Amino acid sequence: VSFARPHSPYDPPQRYLDIYKNAPVPDPAIGDWCDKYAKKLDPEKAAQDAPYGNFGNEYARNSKRHYYANITFIDEQIGRVIQTLKKKGMYDDALIIFVSDHGDMMGDHYHWRKTYPYEGSTHVPYIVKWPAADHIAPGKIDAPVELRDILPTFLDVADVTIPADMDGRSLLPLAKGTETNWRKYLDLEHATCYSDDNYWCALTDGKIKYVWRIHTGAEELFDLTKDPQELHNAVNDKKYKKQLEEMRNEMIRHLSERGEEFIKDGQLVVREKTMLYGPNYPEK
C-alpha cells in the first residue's frame, strides 16, 4: 500500500490540521555548519519547491504542523487496513512492514524536503509486524537496516529461497536473535540535485556518520549518539581524529570497487562531474 503523503505539498485534510492548530511544535534544528543558508528570506518570494532557505521559525513550525497532520492522516488509513485484516481473520498471519523512502528536513539547518545526508531526510520509520507463527516478541533492534531488506524478508517469511545475487538481507534472523554477522554500516548516496554540492556519499552505523562531498572533497562527521540533531560538524575536532580516519578508510574500502573515478592510489577522488547523465542534466 503506497501513500503520497506526507510528501510535499503539505496539504492535509482540514480535520487533521485542526488537531495541531495550537499544538506546541519545536523550532528547527540549526547546526553550527550551515551559515551559508542563514540569510532570512521571504517565503512569499521564494520558489515553491525551494530546497534551502531561512524562512523563519514560525514558518517552519507551521510547516511541521501540516506535516504532522499528514502523518496522522496516514496513520488513520493504515489503521483501516489493519482493522480490515483483523475482520477477515488475516492479521495474525500477515507480515506488515511500515517504512518510508525518505523523510523531510522541515527547515532543519535551513534545508527543506529530501536528498540530503542528514537525519531529517534519511532517518525513517522501519516498523515490522511479524506473523504470529514466528513467535517474535515486540522490541527494538539496534542495527542498520535498509529498504533493500524488505523483499528478502518477505521471501524468507514465506519460506522461499532468497536468490544469492539479491540486494538486501532478510530481517528474520535479526529479529529472532540468530544473526551474528550483520552489516556494519548503511551506505547513503545521492547524485547532483538542487545544487552542485549536493552530490555525496555517506556511511553511518546509527552512532557516527561520515559524509563525503564528491564535487568538493568536503567532509562532515556527526556523533549521532551525543548530537542526534547534527548540530556540530566534528570533522575538525581533534578528539574525533581517529574516528574520522576510520570512517574515511571505510568509505575508501566501500567505493574502491567502483574504480579509479572514485578511488585512486588509496585516496578518495574529487569528481568534476556527476555520474548522473541525461537530457535534463546535460552539463552535469
Report each predicted region and the residues it spans:
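Active-site-proximal cap/lid insertion segments
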Residues: S2-P144, V157-D165, W212-H215, E219, ...
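Residues that form generic nucleotide/phosphate-binding pockets
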Residues: I19, A23, L174, E250, ...
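C-terminal cap/loop subdomain of S1 sulfatases and analogous C-terminal strand-loop tails that border
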Residues: H102-D108, R148-L151, D156-E220, L224, ...
